[in-house]
Amino acid sequence: MTLKNKSIVVLLSGGLDSSTVTGIAKKSEAKIFGLSFDYGQRHKKELNSASIIAKHFDIDEFKIIKLDLSLWGGSSLTDTQKNIPIEGVQTNKIPNTYVPGRNTIFISVALSYAEAIDADFIGLGVNALDYSGYPDCRPDYIKKFQELADLANKRGRENNPIKLWTPLLDLNKEEIIKLAFDNHVPLDKTWSCYSGNSKPCGKCDSCRIRNAAYEKWLNNNNKK
């Protein structure tokens, strides 16, 4: 799949994954339209990181959409009465940091935007190996949403569908960090932590997964 001279809407949260997707798209000479969401998340610092990444890669357009999912809560990311789990990553259950329907809502907005500007792709930073077990980051979810997208808009019905582009889907976090360096992502400007603090907590799932992968990448590169 070539992205050169193609238009792509990237869901840019400001985290490691979405920033890496943006970097890959930039290196591929795509026309990039970034979308970020102010959805009532406690870690609003990611919005600042998203803006910095958008400027770093000089993308064609960047929008922050106000869409307050904290109105009904259901997640420790949008409800400050719930504690963010810090006991370590658990693989046998979906953690309370899962935001009900978040990816479905965000990708739907991106699909509408992409169709309006006649973009060819929607870039997503989802990955199914090193993640917190969210149901909307898995390959079967992406496959089914693509099927929905093909049916749900004019371009799909005219056999010119907008494609979901998920270059990180089958990669682990260490591989993503390597890709980030290869594509000139300023990792120190990205934000992964779920806490609303000014510095990463180092204890939430997102911090633990990222830090462990970075340590592994560092160790492997020091051996070379």
Swiss-Prot record:
Physiological role: Catalyzes the ATP-dependent conversion of 7-carboxy-7-deazaguanine (CDG) to 7-cyano-7-deazaguanine (preQ(0)).
InterPro entries reported for this sequence: QueC, Rossmann-like_a/b/a_fold
Amino acids binding ATP: L12, S13, G14, G15, L16, D17, S18, S19, T20, V21, T22
HAMAP family membership: QueC
Class of this enzyme: ligase
UniProt organism field: Prochlorococcus marinus (strain AS9601)
Record's protein name: 7-cyano-7-deazaguanine synthase
EC number: 6.3.4.20
Catalytic activities: 7-carboxy-7-deazaguanine + NH4(+) + ATP = 7-cyano-7-deazaguanine + ADP + phosphate + H2O + H(+)
